[in-house]
């Protein structure tokens, strides 16, 4: 397997759509390898600030010597509470990248890859108590079948779900390769089917729909009026999650969606299916915190 260094996606598009005030406060809710934070700091003035967060405890933050940067480990579903505890209010923008990094995928012990063996874990946030194997032990056939179907699984979803549950529950030792084989069965499009299945399983392991709904629901309380929330998705399920979350959110409107340039797709394979959703806060949410001037 060729190891590919992770490269943040649509960096310039994020800056162009997020940065409205060079002295503003911006939150990178999924720091990863720091591409978006680095670009934002490069465009901010001396009074600007970037708060970088990531739920992955193994992440090491750059820019620690930059007085305009602050960092911490937190899941973006906890964004509102994290900032409240830090007495930070009135952000000009938030960006969240919903895809896993290549660094995480290539770490076999995380179990995120269907190309080499690893434990059936898939937790991006290690503070989550239950790995995927534990979740599958108590997941019903109908639930897994529905998740596979929602993620565009191209095979017989119920049969694949049944094989996955059987091998996880009955085998004495099971790896991610066994799960990939169970998902694909005898189908000749195995690689694509395994990718779809692993997206569904990763979403389940990390409660991704619930995390996104929490982010969208609480973002208006964090943002200033007119502030932006940018969300990067990488498949049709992610796009549907964003749109469904917006329907139930107060004071957020979708301004536009932005696709990567062909040049970026050609040079950064991770951008191929990406889409940037640009949301703007309007009005005053009932749960909004009072605006504070940062010291």
UniProtKB/Swiss-Prot annotation:
Give the EC number(s) under which this enzyme is classified. Answer: 2.1.1.199
Q: Which reaction does it catalyse?
A: cytidine(1402) in 16S rRNA + S-adenosyl-L-methionine = N(4)-methylcytidine(1402) in 16S rRNA + S-adenosyl-L-homocysteine + H(+)
Signal sequence bounds: none
Primary localization class, coarse: cytoplasm
What highest taxon heads this organism's lineage? Bacteria
Q: Alphabetically, which GO biological process terms does the record hold? A: rRNA base methylation
Enumerate the residues binding S-adenosyl-L-methionine.
Answer: 34-36, 54, 76, 97, 104
Please state where this protein is localized: Cytoplasm
Q: Name one GO cellular component term.
A: cytoplasm
**Mind listing the GO molecular function terms for this protein?**
rRNA (cytosine-N4-)-methyltransferase activity
Keywords (A to Z) from UniProt: Cytoplasm, Methyltransferase, rRNA processing, S-adenosyl-L-methionine, Transferase
Record-stated family = Belongs to the methyltransferase superfamily. RsmH family.
State the protein's name: Ribosomal RNA small subunit methyltransferase H
Organism of this sequence: Tremblaya princeps
Upper lineage is: Bacteria, Pseudomonadati, Pseudomonadota, Betaproteobacteria, Candidatus Tremblaya
């Amino acid at each position: 397997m060729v190891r590919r260094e992770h490269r943040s996606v649509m960096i310039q598009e994020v800056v162009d759509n997020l940065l409205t005030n060079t002295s503003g406060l911006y939150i990178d809710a999924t720091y990863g390898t720091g591409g978006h934070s680095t670009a934002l700091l490069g465009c901010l003035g001396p009074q600007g600030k970037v708060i970088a967060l990531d739920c992955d405890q193994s992440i090491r933050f750059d820019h620690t010597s930059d007085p305009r940067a602050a960092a911490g480990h937190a899941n973006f579903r906890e964004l509102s509470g994290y900032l409240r505890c830090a007495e930070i209010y009135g952000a000009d923008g938030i960006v969240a990248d919903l895809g896993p990094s290549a660094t995480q995928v290539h770490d076999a012990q995380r179990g995120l890859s269907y190309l080499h063996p690893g434990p059936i874990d898939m937790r991006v946030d290690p503070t989550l108590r239950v790995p995927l194997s534990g979740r599958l032990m108590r997941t019903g056939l109908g639930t897994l079948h529905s998740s596979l179907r929602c993620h565009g699984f191209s095979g017989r979803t119920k049969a694949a779900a049944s094989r996955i549950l059987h091998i996880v529950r009955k085998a004495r030792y099971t790896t991610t390769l066994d799960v990939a084989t169970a998902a694909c069965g005898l189908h000749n499009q195995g690689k694509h089917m395994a990718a779809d299945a692993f997206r569904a399983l990763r979403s389940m392991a990390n409660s991704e729909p619930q995390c996104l709904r929490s982010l969208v629901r609480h973002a208006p309380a964090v943002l200033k009026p007119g502030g932006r929330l940018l969300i990067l998705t990488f498949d049709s399920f992610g796009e549907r999650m964003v749109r469904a979350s917006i329907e139930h959110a107060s004071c957020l409107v979708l301004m536009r969606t932005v696709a990567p340039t062909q040049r970026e797709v050609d040079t950064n394979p991770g951008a191929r299916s990406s889409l940037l959703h640009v949301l703007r806060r309007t009005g005053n949410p009932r749960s909004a915190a009072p605006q504070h001037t940062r010291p």
